Each structure stands twice: as C-alpha cells, then as structure tokens.
Amino acid sequence: MPQLNPGPWFNILLISWLTFLLILLPKILSHKTNNCPTPQSQDKLFLPPWNWPWL
C-alpha cells in the first residue's frame, strides 16, 4: 500500500508545489485584466434612492 511509505509521494508533492510556486505563479500573476470597473465620471451616476415598499 503506497500510503504507508510517504517518501516518494511526499517528494513528488513537494516538487510539484515548488514548480507551481516558482515557475507558474509569476507567469499567471503577470497577466493584468483590462476591464477596470472605475466609472468615467461620478456626476452622471447619481440615481434617486429606491422605494422599498416591504420595509
């Protein structure tokens, strides 16, 4: 049963996580989203408050 000998499985797990953290994570985080949710102007966004009849 392989779960009784954690030596090779732990090494595989450790190497795969180090590969992910050291190589793949900076490549993934270097991508930026172009869709910034900042409004163009705050003056046009004024809306009257809603009427909540059930409150």
From Swiss-Prot:
It comes from the Eukaryota. Its main location: mitochondrion. Keywords: ATP synthesis, CF(0), Hydrogen ion transport, Ion transport, Membrane, Mitochondrion, Transmembrane, Transmembrane helix, Transport. InterPro entries: ATP8_metazoa, ATPase_protein_8. One of its GO terms (molecular function) is proton transmembrane transporter activity. Disulfide bonds: none annotated. The keyword Ion transport applies. It is found in: Mitochondrion membrane. GO terms for biological process: proton motive force-driven ATP synthesis. It is a single-pass membrane protein. The chain crosses the membrane at residues 9-29. GO terms for cellular component: mitochondrial membrane; proton-transporting ATP synthase complex. Mitochondrial membrane ATP synthase (F(1)F(0) ATP synthase or Complex V) produces ATP from ADP in the presence of a proton gradient across the membrane which is generated by electron transport complexes of the respiratory chain. F-type ATPases consist of two structural domains, F(1) - containing the extramembraneous catalytic core and F(0) - containing the membrane proton channel, linked together by a central stalk and a peripheral stalk. During catalysis, ATP synthesis in the catalytic domain of F(1) is coupled via a rotary mechanism of the central stalk subunits to proton translocation. Belongs to the ATPase protein 8 family. F-type ATPases have 2 components, CF(1) - the catalytic core - and CF(0) - the membrane proton channel. This is ATP synthase protein 8. It comes from Protopterus dolloi (Slender lungfish).
